[in-house]
């Protein structure tokens, strides 16, 4: 939730949460990701959006609901370093692939890759780019017209989110 960072009960089934956990456990992530953004739509904002739509009559009965205020991976990286002393190293595909190959050969530690294992190609490169472009311009124009505005995913939200992960012991991010 945007209000307090509380996340879904079955967090272990959430792909984004598992990716974050794997990258923290590995201590590295793909360098190219710093140039990208992530879509996060907190459930309480989505619920507010749905209620707002239901309060107004519209000839349109299909909307594409997601927060168009994307989270910069660079901001996420900076917050993890600054607020939680998490040292994540941005690595080239080649170095990260080499590191992942080594982890996969270690029976005790290979489980830390569970959050990213399905994102690997045959060469052990992580693939997080897509040619699919989301477009909710019509929906967002309508939402603006009826007075609903998506909130930005900012540093405060990331801190709440990560503190919740820490509280439920999903991720160990204690400062040492």
Located regions from the model:
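Glycine- and acidic
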Residues: 1, 28-39, 58-66, 122-124, ...
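Flexible, glycine-rich beta-alpha linker
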Residues: 1-37, 71-72
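A conserved structural motif in NAD(P)-dependent oxidoreductases
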Residues: 38-46
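Short aromatic/basic micro-patch
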Residues: 40, 70, 133
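Mid/C-terminal beta-alpha module of Rossmann-like enzyme folds, strongest
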Residues: 49-123, 165-168, 172-176
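A conserved mid-domain beta-alpha-beta active-site/ligand-binding segment of alpha/beta enzyme cores
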Residues: 120-129, 134, 139
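Amphipathic terminal alpha-helices
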Residues: 133-176
């Amino acid at each position: 939730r945007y209000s307090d960072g509380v996340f879904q009960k079955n967090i272990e089934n959430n792909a984004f949460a598992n990716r974050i956990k794997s990258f923290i456990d590995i201590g590295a992530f793909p360098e190219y990701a710093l140039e990208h953004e992530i879509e996060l739509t907190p459930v309480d904002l989505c619920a507010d959006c749905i209620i707002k739509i239901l309060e107004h009559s519209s000839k349109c009965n299909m909307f594409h609901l997601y927060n168009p205020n994307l989270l910069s991976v660079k901001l996420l990286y900076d917050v993890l370093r600054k607020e939680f002393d998490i040292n994540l190293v941005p690595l080239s595909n080649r170095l990260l692939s080499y590191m992942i190959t080594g982890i996969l050969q270690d029976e005790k530690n290979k489980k830390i890759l569970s959050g990213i294992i399905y994102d690997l190609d045959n060469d052990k490169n992580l693939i997080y780019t897509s040619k699919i472009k989301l477009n909710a311009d019509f929906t967002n124009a309508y939402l603006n017209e009826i007075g609903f505005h998506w909130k930005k995913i900012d540093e405060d939200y990331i801190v709440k989110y990560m503190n919740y992960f820490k509280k439920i012991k999903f991720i160990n991010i204690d400062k040492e």
